[in-house]
């Protein structure tokens, strides 16, 4: 992304992306090559390294007061839980930590991360994402999350994770403002946009 013009909007760029990003290890079928549950053959860090910049992260927060460690990456529901390359459960923390590591090493790049609950607690997912954003915002200038209110330019998005979400935040259960966070930092709510069109 280093060669992209700084003043272009991130939304004007066609980014390579992956569907059901965490499913490299999900093989519930007899023959892996014909698996209907595994949408990827590369693990998350491999996808980053080959140029993928837009990710579909499907989550299962198993409790309402979840942290990123408590949120499993899944395909559909917990039956198809994703694993890392070592066979360990793949968590939102793994994805976010790898994203920060990558952006620290490649500050001209940007990551667009669509987060969706496929199973479990939506409140828990919002809290987990919120705790990550809060930790990043506390870093000041080295924050790796886009915290603007509009779609960022390429320059503004460099070195940042730009969240998009497909879930509502029920502020009666978890209010980002209680943590001094702006709900916009969780990303545009595509789930709400889709519902308005129906």
Describe the function of each predicted region:
Residues 1-54, 63-105, 110, 165, ...:
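Long, acidic (Asp/Glu-rich), low-complexity accessory segments flanking structured domains
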Residues 61, 106-121:
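Active-site groove signature of glycoside hydrolases
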Residues 89-99, 124-135:
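Well-ordered, non-membrane alpha-helical segments in soluble/globular domains
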Residues 110, 158-161:
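Short, surface-exposed beta-edge/turn micro-motifs
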Residues 132-149, 154:
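Acidic, His- and aromatic-enriched active-site or binding-groove loops in soluble protein domains
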Residues 148-151, 155-158, 165-168:
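A substrate-binding/cap region within the structured catalytic cores of diverse enzymes
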Residues 164-198:
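C-terminal active-site rim and adjoining tail of enzyme catalytic domains
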């Amino acid at each position: 992304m280093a060669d992209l013009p700084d003043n272009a909007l991130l939304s004007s760029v066609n980014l390579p992306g992956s569907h059901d990003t965490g499913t490299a290890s999900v093989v519930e079928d007899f023959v892996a090559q014909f698996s209907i549950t595994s949408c990827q053959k590369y693990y998350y860090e491999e996808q980053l390294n080959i140029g993928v910049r837009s990710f579909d992260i499907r989550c299962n927060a198993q409790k309402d007061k979840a942290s990123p460690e408590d949120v499993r990456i899944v395909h559909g529901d917990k039956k198809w839980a994703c694993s890392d390359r070592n066979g360990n459960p793949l968590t939102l923390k793994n994805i976010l930590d790898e994203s920060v590591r990558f952006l620290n090493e490649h500050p001209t790049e940007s990551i667009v991360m669509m987060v969706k609950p496929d199973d479990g607690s939506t409140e828990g997912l919002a809290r987990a994402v919120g705790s990550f954003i809060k930790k990043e915002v506390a870093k000041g200038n080295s924050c790796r999350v886009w915290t603007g209110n509009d779609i960022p330019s390429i320059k503004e998005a460099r070195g940042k994770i730009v969240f998009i979400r497909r879930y509502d935040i029920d502020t009666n259960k978890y209010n980002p403002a209680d943590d001094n966070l702006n709900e916009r930092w969780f990303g545009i709510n595509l789930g709400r946009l889709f519902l308005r069109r129906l």
